[in-house]
């Protein structure tokens, strides 16, 4: 009796099954992050439990602990999703996100500032409630305090890169150093300033955006580059 030939499609099917499992795992992770983001926004950090997140995501609690470094790690993922505009977008490196790429590729200093500022009202609106929850939790949780410091350091470093990109294109006003530009960007674009103007004083996101673009241009750019949009 002849031996049947080996089936040639076994390996591709195994690869397909592996890719399918990876995509299912990624989809589950995204569902958990989105559920966590919603729950943290609604309940605050202290009021959020892993059980609530698991129920919202349709998974068991053990699945969350296998995927994230506890509640603090899940909060970090929720913040990243809020900044990016969703868990799926957060999976892409920052520099590959279209809005960020547009800022990086823009050569005109005034338009570079405007492109950057265009992204900020939405980010602040999504992140500001989480920032308040993080500040409250950081006061009593060392792990959250470290996360708060890390996120602020990352924001400061991001403003340093932005200031360097302005300087590289000759876009800084005479007498303004890269370090000063970094600190101005870091301060003026803080969640605190957004909360004071938009939340406390009732400015519209559009008014805040235009004010921020105009202020940064007037302080940082050479004369002749301050014209409003």
Language-model regions, residue ranges each:
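Hydrophobic/aromatic-rich alpha-helical bundle segments in the mid-to-C-terminal region
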Residues: 167-215, 223-229
């Amino acid at each position: 009796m002849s031996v049947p030939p080996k089936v040639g499609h076994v390996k591709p099917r195994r690869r397909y099954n592996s890719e399918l499992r990876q995509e299912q795992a990624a989809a589950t992770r995204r569902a958990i992050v989105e559920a966590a983001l919603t729950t943290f926004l609604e309940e605050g950090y202290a009021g959020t439990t892993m059980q609530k997140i698991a129920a919202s995501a349709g998974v068991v609690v053990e699945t969350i602990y296998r995927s994230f470094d506890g509640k603090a790690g899940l909060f970090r993922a929720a913040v990243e999703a809020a900044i990016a505009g969703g868990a799926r977008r957060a999976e892409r490196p920052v520099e590959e996100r279209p809005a960020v790429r547009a800022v990086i590729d823009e050569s005109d200093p005034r338009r570079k500032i405007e492109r950057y500022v265009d992204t900020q009202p939405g980010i602040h609106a999504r992140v500001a409630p989480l920032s308040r929850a993080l500040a409250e939790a950081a006061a009593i949780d060392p792990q959250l305090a470290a996360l708060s410091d890390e996120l602020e350091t990352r924001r400061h470093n991001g403003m340093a890169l932005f200031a360097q990109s302005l300087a590289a294109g000759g876009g800084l006003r005479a007498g303004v150093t890269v370090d000063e530009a970094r600190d101005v960007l870091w301060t003026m674009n803080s969640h605190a300033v957004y909360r004071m103007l938009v939340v406390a004083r009732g400015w519209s996101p559009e008014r805040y955006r235009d004010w921020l673009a105009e202020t940064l241009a007037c302080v940082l750019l050479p004369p002749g580059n301050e014209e409003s949009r």
